[in-house]
């Protein structure tokens, strides 16, 4: 292993560890990480960022699929949506790419309001997105499975294919075609069927990355056996409806990230992107994190418990801001101190552990 390889490995380990901090303490994030790390073979954050760098070029579309509707208010949750908006900003900063949010119509006003906060113009016409600077797109996606099939084909046939598709905290149908919340309740009627589009793009060889924090999200079928064995409600006949399929999403992804909170997994990928490109501006500030969370909550997005107080998966704005700041500080230190500690690198590598 070279010094550079060790630096990259350790930054990935740091970011993976941060996104899997477990203040709640019941350990699901560690279970998922064990499976996703075994599948990936290296730090998840660095892997995803590296794949993006290898394929994304200036002007490329990148589809960001997100949006999970929760009971009892039938409102979109914060997790997934907040990081999707901040990821859109990062992709413009890193590549001058053209991000397109694909989500339930319920999320449209939040996307509109948050786009202003991150400094991007929002268009539904992708021709405008492609030709205009500092712009992003939105495509509201159908909740009807039959119409979703047609819409997915239409999106693929009528637009330039994206360089990548990234799903963040997006519900995925189980093997019976049903969508569930974390505790096994059926939410099929509420959810956009965006996993249909994700899978079609994957079949076409588009770079695909899926981020989840439980197993009911798009792409988590990649580690199906692991999730079915260890995650509650995931196995067959363990959900609370009559479908008998469990909450595990059947869809698979070539690259996955699992974390305590899906947004934290996305932030880890974004921080890794900033590190690999040696450009700290790619990663957002704690202040922008708080601003987007506030805009999202004022647009009707809820915490997982249904509250309109800004929070993501039960974690307050303060905790999310601290997470962003700590990830950012790790990356900044790594970039600013590259080339230092040469003696220690040489000595450590000489011992043969790495």
Residues covered by each model-derived region:
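Histidine-anchored nucleotide/phosphate-binding helix
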Residues: 77-96
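C-terminal accessory domains and tails appended to enzymatic cores
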Residues: 7-8, 260-263, 280-354
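Glycine/threonine-rich flexible loop motifs
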Residues: 73-76, 175-189
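Short internal beta-strands
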Residues: 98-106
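A glycine-rich helix N-cap at a beta->alpha junction
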Residues: 115-151
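A short helix->loop->beta-strand "cap" motif at the edges of active sites that frequently abuts
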Residues: 96-97, 202-208
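Short alpha-helices
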Residues: 188-195, 207, 211-290
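Positively charged, low-complexity intrinsically disordered leader regions
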Residues: 1-61
């Amino acid at each position: 292993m070279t010094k550079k390889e060790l630096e990259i490995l350790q930054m990935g380990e740091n970011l993976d560890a941060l996104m899997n901090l477990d203040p709640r303490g019941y350990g699901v994030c560690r279970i998922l990480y064990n499976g996703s790390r075994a599948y990936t073979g290296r730090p998840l954050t660095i892997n995803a960022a590296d794949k993006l760098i290898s394929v994304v070029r200036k002007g490329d579309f990148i589809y960001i699929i997100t949006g999970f509707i929760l009971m009892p208010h039938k409102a979109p949750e914060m997790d997934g949506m907040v990081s999707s908006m901040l990821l859109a900003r990062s992709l413009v900063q890193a590549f001058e790419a053209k991000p397109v949010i694909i989500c339930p119509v319920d999320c449209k006003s939040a996307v509109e309001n948050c786009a202003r906060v991150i400094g991007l113009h929002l268009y539904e016409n992708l021709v405008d997105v492609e030709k205009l600077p500092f712009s992003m797109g939105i495509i509201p996606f159908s909740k009807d499975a039959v119409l979703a099939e047609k819409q997915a084909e239409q999106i693929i046939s009528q637009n330039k294919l994206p360089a990548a598709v990234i799903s963040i905290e997006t519900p995925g149908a189980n093997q019976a075609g049903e969508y569930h919340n974390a505790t096994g309740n059926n939410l099929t009627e509420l959810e956009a069927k965006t996993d249909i589009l994700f899978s079609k793009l994957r079949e076409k060889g588009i770079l695909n990355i899926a981020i989840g924090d439980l197993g009911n999200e798009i792409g988590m079928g990649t580690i199906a056996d692991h999730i079915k064995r260890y995650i509650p409600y995931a196995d067959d006949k363990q959900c609370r409806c009559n479908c008998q399929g469990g909450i595990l999403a059947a869809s698979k992804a070539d690259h996955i990230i699992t974390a305590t909170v899906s947004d934290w997994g996305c932030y880890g990928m974004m921080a890794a992107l900033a590190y690999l490109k040696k450009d700290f501006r790619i990663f957002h500030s704690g202040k922008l994190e708080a601003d987007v969370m506030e805009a999202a909550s004022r647009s009707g997005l809820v915490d997982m418990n249904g509250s309109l107080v800004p929070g993501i998966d039960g974690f307050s704005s303060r905790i999310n801001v601290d997470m962003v700041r700590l990830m950012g500080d790790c990356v900044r230190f790594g970039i600013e101190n590259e080339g230092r500690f040469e003696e220690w690198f040489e000595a450590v590598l000489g011992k043969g552990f790495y």
